[in-house]
Amino acid sequence: MKKILVTGGTGFIGAAISKYFCDKGYQITILDNNSRGKLKRITQSKKKIKFIFGDITKYEDVYKASRNQDYIFHLAAINGTKFFYEKPDKVLDVSCKGIINVIEAAKKLKIKNIFLASSSEVYHLPNKIPTDESEPIKIPDILNPRFSYAGGKILTELMGINNAKFFNKMIIFRPHNVYGNDMGNEHVIPEMIRKVKNAKKSIKMKGSGLQTRSFIYIDDFVEAFYLIFKKGKHLNIYNIGTQEKIRIIDLAKVIIKIFKKKNYN
């Protein structure tokens, strides 16, 4: 039975991946400090999944959790736009120390397979939509704390790529707007649902509402990741998302219709 360490495994995406691979027969260990994750996300599988409370920024915690593992899925991060602005130093601290600790522990323990979670945030405003993996990644304003998360993900990719010679598989995946049950409230879909549910006649939107997003449901995301796990190539980068675009204003209209609200602006 192959063993997999999932950092950030009680987070929304990490928990879904952990449960899916557990059901496939893999032996899963999760390293998380639950600062934003929820242990209840893996409750149904807790007899099969080993949970280690630890801090990704502490090398000793990462090293201990990594022992006897065949793969590392590195997803530990601080996500959510609110935190990018309020705690950019912490966002970068987790990203930078986390990837350094993961790579150093893997090299020392001779773990040869690492899958690194990046983000669609690294593209910022892409030149072409749909966006493929050849699109340049960028930080448009180094002084804007909004890009602390994207900067940390770019560093994660750089660390993985430039240490790839030590591994059989160093694979980077970039999730694009994943949504689903228990994703947390700091994202556009649950935030919009909350606004529509609580408002009587109208809601305020950030910006014009004409911005477009492509969303992927968590179950579809996990299946796509499993395909990358099985067939992905060393040093390849993979977007995980859909090509179906929706304007934010149209997303709001869909949610309004679901709530059956009439005479709504």
Regions found by a protein language model. Give the residues of each.
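Loop/helix-junction capping segments adjacent to catalytic residues or to phosphate/diphosphate-binding pockets
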Residues: 59, 182, 215
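Residue-level signature of the cytosolic catalytic core of signaling kinases
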Residues: 45, 181-185, 244
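C-terminal substrate-binding subdomain of Rossmann-fold SDR/epimerase-dehydratase oxidoreductases
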Residues: 17, 54, 197-265
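Heptad-repeat alpha-helical coiled-coil signaling segments
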Residues: 177, 183, 210-213
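N-terminal Rossmann-like NAD(P)+-binding domain of SDR-like oxidoreductases, especially those catalyzing
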Residues: 1-178, 229, 248
